[in-house]
Amino acid sequence: MELNQPPLPTEIDGDAYHKPSFNDLGLKESVLKSVYEAGFTSPSPIQEKAIPAVLQGRDVIAQAQTGTGKTAAFALPIINNLKNNHTIEALVITPTRELAMQISDEIFKLGKHTRTKTVCVYGGQSVKKQCEFIKKNPQVMIATPGRLLDHLKNERIHKFVPKVVVLDESDEMLDMGFLDDIEEIFDYLPSEAQILLFSATMPEPIKRLADKILENPIKIHIAPSNITNTDITQRFYVINEHERAEAIMRLLDTQAPKKSIVFTRTKKEADELHQFLASKNYKSTALHGDMDQRDRRSSIMAFKKNDADVLVATDVASRGLDISGVSHVFNYHLPLNTESYIHRIGRTGRAGKKGMAITLVTPLEYKELLRMQKEIDSEIELFEIPTINENQIIKTLHDAKVSEGIISLYEQLTEIFEPSQLVLKLLSLQFETSKIGLNQQEIDAIQNPKEKTPKPSNKKTPQHERARSFKKGQHRDRHPKTNHYSKKPKRR
C-alpha cells in the first residue's frame, strides 16, 4: 500500500519546518504504539525529516550527530514497511559490535507490536551460531562490515536481497578502515535497494561513496545548533595534572550522580581509573577495545542493570552507546576534538531528561577549551572543585580507627596545645589538604594572562580563600545533602 504523502524536497534543513508529532509522520498504529510505550514523546529533528523520506522509498543521506535519535529515524520506517516474507528485508551496517547490539535491541523494542525479528552479526561470536539464527528467517540484519563480508564470501546467507540498506556511523567506518569492505559488500547487494547513509560528519571519502551508491537522495542536515542539547548543563573544572583521579572521586561524592560515564583517552587509563575507583568502594566497571567480547558485554550489562553506576570508557563507547538514565558524563581529559566532545556528552540529557557534562582541564588545556566552546556555540561554565563537606568529615572521624601510635601522638600534642586548639588546627589542616584544583588567584591568572600573577602550583590554600565569589559568571559548586577505493561497487 502506497502512502499518499506530498513530494519531498531534495534537500532538507533541520530548522526548516515546525515540529510535528509522531502521528503526523505516516507510521502505522502498531508502530506508534511501540513508539509511545518506549517513552518517545515527539520526534527529534532528524526523525521528523528522515522518517517521511524513508517511508516514500527515497535514498537518504543524513548528517546528524550521535544522540540525535538517528536509530529510530531509520528503524521506525523500516519496521513500518516490513512485509514478513520470510527473507532479510533490511540490512543495517554499523562499525562496532556494541552499536550493532544496541541497534538490534532498539529495533526489537520499537518492533514489539509488529513482532519484528532481528539477527545481529559481528566478529567475536560463533559463526555456526550466527548461521543458525540467520536460518530462522529474520526480517532485519544488523551487522559489522568484516563479519558480514565473511558470511557473503562464504555464501552462508541465502536469498539475500534486502530492500533497504542502512550505513550507520559512516564516518566512523571510514576512520576504522572499513570503506573497502563496504564497497565489496555492495557487490553482493541488489542495485534497486533503498540506501540510507547516516554520518556525523561528511569527509570527502564519504561524499564520494555516497555519489557511487545513492540515487537522487534526499539530503538531510541537522546543524550543530540543533545538536547541543539544552537539557545538558556543561561545566569545567581547572585542576593540576596529577589531581585527575582525586577530582573525579570528589565530584562523584559531591554530585552524587545516579549513573555516570567517565571518558578517558587511553585503554590503560580506563583500566587504572576503574581499579582506583573500585579500590575506593565505588561501583565501577570499564569498557575499552582491548577487552574481549564477553567482558565488554558483561560491563555494558552491569551498567545497564545498575550493578555498576560508574562506567569508565574510551571513545569506543561514545559512539552509539545507548544506555538510559545516564545523569552525568565526565571527560577525564579535554577531548581531542569538538566532534568527540559532542559525541561524549550526548550520552546524557536524553529523552527529555536533564544531564550534566563535566570536563577536567589543566591550565595548559584552557585555551583549547575556549576554542571548543566557540565551535559548539554553547556555554561551558567554570566551577571550582568543592571541598569535603562537614558531613563527610564527621563520617571520616567516626569511622577512623585509633591505634596505639595515635594515642601516643595525641598525648605528646596535648602537652603542646590546648585540646580545643589542637582540634581546630587539625580541622584546618584537613580542609587545606582536601583542596583539589586551582585557587582563585590561579584561575584569575588563566583568565587574564596579561596580568602578572603567580603560576599555578600545588600550594595549599586556606578554606577562607576558596570562599570568595568567582568572577565572570563562575559559580561555586554546592554540596549535595548527604582514503581511496579499491574498486567501484557494482549495482545489479
From Swiss-Prot:
Residue ranges occupied by any Helicase ATP-binding domain in the UniProt entry: 51-220
Record-level GO cellular component terms: cytosol
EC numbers on record: 3.6.4.13
GO molecular function per UniProt: ATP binding; ATP hydrolysis activity; RNA helicase activity; RNA strand annealing activity
Main localization of the protein described in the UniProt heading: cytoplasm
Pfam name, any one: DEAD
Chain positions of motif DEAD box: 168-171
PROSITE patterns linked: HELICASE_ATP_BIND_1 (PS51192), HELICASE_CTER (PS51194), Q_MOTIF (PS51195)
Group of enzyme by EC: hydrolase
Family: Belongs to the DEAD box helicase family.
Summary of subunit composition and partner proteins: Homodimer. Interacts with RNase J (rnj), might be a member of a minimal RNA degradosome complex.
Protein name: DEAD-box ATP-dependent RNA helicase RhpA
Species of the source: Helicobacter pylori (strain ATCC 700392 / 26695)
Gene for this chain: rhpA
